Each structure stands twice: as structure tokens, then as C-alpha cells.
């Protein structure tokens, strides 16, 4: 698979055409099975014989055949809610869910609107100064909006924010060198450790403080920031060791706290950036679809769901592992083999969405039948927040700039350099005359 993600959808279509489970080679020469069929994905993601815990269920990782030198090691070496399995996952999910409540998310709606309004003011000002009036909607709106929402949700002070935004963007780049991956992870771990220490001294009404409270009574020893990925196995408990012991009483250890904060923050930013950027491109490329919303025949929720389907913000999810032999159609995936779940390819499956599955259609009957937030026990905790942000942000943008158009041909847009993260690197637009934003 192309680590630079130069044609995520083309690669997905190729894999779909080759069967329900296809052998692939990941960046760095690691073999895996790619699964793109929606029905098969749903089965696998609810099958107890499929795990996300490399320390327990991936022999290649346990034996050191794949290790810290692998450029994608950070995706499997961290131990958090996303990479947990079984009882451990249920424990962490309960703790995360107790902090990431529907009430806390719901209260963010007005603040999302305020952040959007401020960013739109800034983008309009930037357009007045820009050559030809061209501005990048991704860089000036889609990227900072979810970042600011998450930074506020986490109660992150201003002095941490700039560094975290840069680090998180680098985290999703799968075409980077090993040295860059090591440096980025070390910086992320160090910064989040500093944040936890700050919040212990000055707790507030925020997600970080809530998770610290959930982990109270856990081992207070600070493992320190790993200097590079080679230190991850020691910090996490050693290759094959199963990771850190759960603290007494089922709380969070210091390592678990930092790892899960990293997971929540990164998962809450980059995918929503892609969702917003993709939706903007799709609407500007298909103005008839935007008119359906403006005429009241479709809603902004319809736009969000169809954008999630046709351009999944997370193209591929790595990795899962067969706990025992698993049959997929005529293929048997042997115990211990790794799997890649192709969410972007699944979203365009013609067997589910029709022969025009690649077309953006906000009235499509199957627009909600996507897997872009996952499925089963690992369904994304932040899905309600991502939907809330996208609906508010898209309506605010198109209400404010009803004449906005792409400044380049759609084919000239460059993808992010990743086969995991799926979205454009920039979205250059001409805003057109603004309105007062009231409709």
C-alpha cells in the first residue's frame, strides 16, 4: 500500500476488486490482509477473535520481527483505548466514557459556533490581504476549528497549543522517515506529560482533569517521555509483556492516562479536519448538492453523512490481529496475521451504494450506511462531537460566503501524505462577497 496515499480511492477500488481479504504490503515491508467489503468489516469488528492488541496477539511484534524501527510502529506500540482488547478495553472504555459524556459534548455547541465565527472573520481579513484573494479553507478554517474545540475541551493552556497542533498533524503522516516519526512521538509524549503535570496542579472543569480524577489512586510514578520509539517497549511494559498492569481499583496508570489523552486529542482533531475539508471540496465541486441544502430539501446532517461515506476521513485503520484462524469467504486468515480495515474503500462499495457509489449525493438513501467512525466495541467515542462540529462549521461557512468557489481545478488538489488520513493538503478558494451570516 502506498504510504504517501497518492490515490487512496483508486487503491481502494483495486483492493475491492480482488476479493474480500487481500494480501498487501504496508510501508516498511510489513505484510497484512486488507479488508474492504462492508459486510465483512462489520463481522470482523464484532468478532472476539479479532484484536487490536499487538502485545498479546501479533507474533511478529512479540518476537521483534516488527519493532521500533518500523515507521508505523507508533500506531501499534502505544497502549490506549484504541489498541486494547477484551476486559482491558471494557475497563478503559468505561473510564473514557465517564469523562467524555454526552452532556459535555452537547454543551460545546454554542462554543463551536463562536469559534467558527471568529475564524470566518479572520479568513475574510486574510482574503483581503492575499494575492488574488485566494485563501486556504483547510489551513484557516477546517484545521484550526476542531483543534481549538479539542484544546478547549481538554482545558489546554495557550502555551501548549501551538506545539500540540504541529505534533498532531505530523502524527498522521505515514510517509515520514523513521527519525521524524521518533522525534514526533517523543515530542507528543513529552508535551502531554507536561500537560498532565500542569493539570494535577491546576485542575479545572475539563476532560483532562476528569480523566485525571478517573485515574486517581493509580500509580503516580511518571514514566517520563521516551526519547524515541525504541524506548516505547520499555515504557509500555516490554515487547510481548502485555503492557502496564492496570492499577488497583481499575483506575488509570500514569502511562495509560498520557497514552489515552494522546489518543483522544489526535482522534478528535485530524479526522474532523479531513471531514470538513472534504465536505467543502465536495460541495464546491457539486453546486447542485449545495442547492439541495439551501432549498431545504436536504440538511447539513445529510451533507456530513454523505461526505463521511464518499470520503472517509480515515481511509485505512491499522492494525488488527487474528486471535485464531478466521475465515473470510473462501480465505482463511491465519492466527497472528495482521489486518488493515479499508473504511474509504468500504464507503464506495457498489454492492451497498449502487453503481454510482463514487458520486457525492446528499439525497442518497444509503448515505448513513458507512463505517467511517468504525463499528462494534471500537466505535469512535468522539463521533457525536465530530458530527456536531461539522454541521455547525459547514453551515456557518456557506452562510457567510454563499458565492465561495474553488480557486483551482478539483484535480489539482493534493492529498495529505498518508494512507491512513484522507483529505486534501490545501483547499484554495475565492470567498466571494460575504453576508451577515444570518439565514
PLM features: what roles do these ranges have?
Residues 1-439:
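Cytochrome P450
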Amino acid at each position: 500500500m502506498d504510504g504517501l496515499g497518492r490515490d487512496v480511492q483508486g487503491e481502494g477500488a483495486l483492493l475491492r476488486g480482488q476479493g474480500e481479504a487481500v494480501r498487501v504490503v504496508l510501508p516498511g515491508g510489513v505484510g497484512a490482509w486488507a479488508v474492504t467489503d462492508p459486510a465483512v468489516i462489520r463481522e470482523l469488528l464484532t468478532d472476539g477473535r479479532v484484536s487490536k492488541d499487538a502485545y498479546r496477539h501479533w507474533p511478529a511484534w512479540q518476537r521483534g520481527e516488527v519493532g521500533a524501527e518500523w515507521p508505523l510502529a507508533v500506531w501499534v506500540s502505544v497502549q490506549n483505548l484504541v489498541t486494547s482488547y477484551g476486559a482491558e478495553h471494557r475497563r478503559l472504555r468505561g473510564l473514557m466514557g465517564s469523562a467524555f459524556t454526552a452532556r459535555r459534548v452537547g454543551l460545546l455547541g454554542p462554543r463551536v459556533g463562536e469559534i467558527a465565527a471568529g475564524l470566518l472573520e479572520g479568513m475574510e481579513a486574510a482574503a483581503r490581504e492575499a494575492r488574488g484573494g485566494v485563501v486556504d479553507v483547510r489551513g484557516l478554517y477546517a484545521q484550526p476549528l476542531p483543534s481549538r474545540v479539542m484544546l478547549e475541551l481538554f482545558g489546554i493552556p495557550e502555551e501548549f497549543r501551538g506545539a500540540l497542533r504541529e505534533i498532531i498533524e505530523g502524527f498522521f503522516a505515514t510517509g515520514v522517515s523513521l527519525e521524524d516519526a521518533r522525534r514526533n512521538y517523543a515530542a507528543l509524549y513529552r508535551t502531554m506529560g507536561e500537560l498532565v503535570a500542569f493539570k494535577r496542579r491546576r485542575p479545572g472543569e475539563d476532560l483532562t482533569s476528569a480523566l485525571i480524577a478517573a485515574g486517581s489512586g493509580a500509580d503516580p510514578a511518571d514514566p517520563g517521555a521516551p526519547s524515541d520509539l525504541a524506548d516505547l517497549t520499555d515504557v509500555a511494559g516490554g515487547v510481548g509483556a502485555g503492557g502496564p498492569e492496570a492499577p488497583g481499583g481499575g483506575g488509570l496508570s500514569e502511562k495509560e492516562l498520557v497514552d489515552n489523552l494522546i489518543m483522544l486529542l489526535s482522534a478528535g482533531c485530524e479526522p474532523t479536519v479531513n471531514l470538513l475539508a472534504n465536505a467543502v471540496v465536495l460541495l464546491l465541486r457539486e453546486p447542485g448538492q449545495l442547492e439541495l441544502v439551501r432549498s431545504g430539501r436536504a440538511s447539513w446532517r445529510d451533507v456530513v453523512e454523505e461526505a463521511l461515506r464518499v470520503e472517509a476521513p480515515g481511509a485505512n485503520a491499522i492494525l488488527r490481529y487474528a486471535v485464531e484462524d478466521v475465515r473470510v469467504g473462501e480465505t482463511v486468515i491465519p492466527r497472528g496475521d495482521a489486518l488493515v480495515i479499508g473504511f474509504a474503500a468500504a464507503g464506495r462499495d457498489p454492492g451497498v451504494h449502487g453503481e454510482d457509489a463514487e458520486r457525492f449525493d446528499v439525497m442518497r438513501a444509503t448515505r448513513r450506511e458507512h463505517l467511517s467512525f468504525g463499528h462494534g466495541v471500537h466505535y469512535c467515542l468522539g463521533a457525536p462531537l465530530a458530527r456536531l462540529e461539522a454541521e455547525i462549521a459547514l453551515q456557518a461557512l456557506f452562510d457567510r460566503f454563499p458565492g465561495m468557489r474553488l480557486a483551482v481545478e478539483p484535480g489539482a488538489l493534493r492529498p495529505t501524505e498518508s494512507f491512513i488520513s484522507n483529505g486534501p493538503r490545501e483547499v484554495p478558494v475565492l470567498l466571494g462577497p460575504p453576508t451577515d451570516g444570518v439565514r
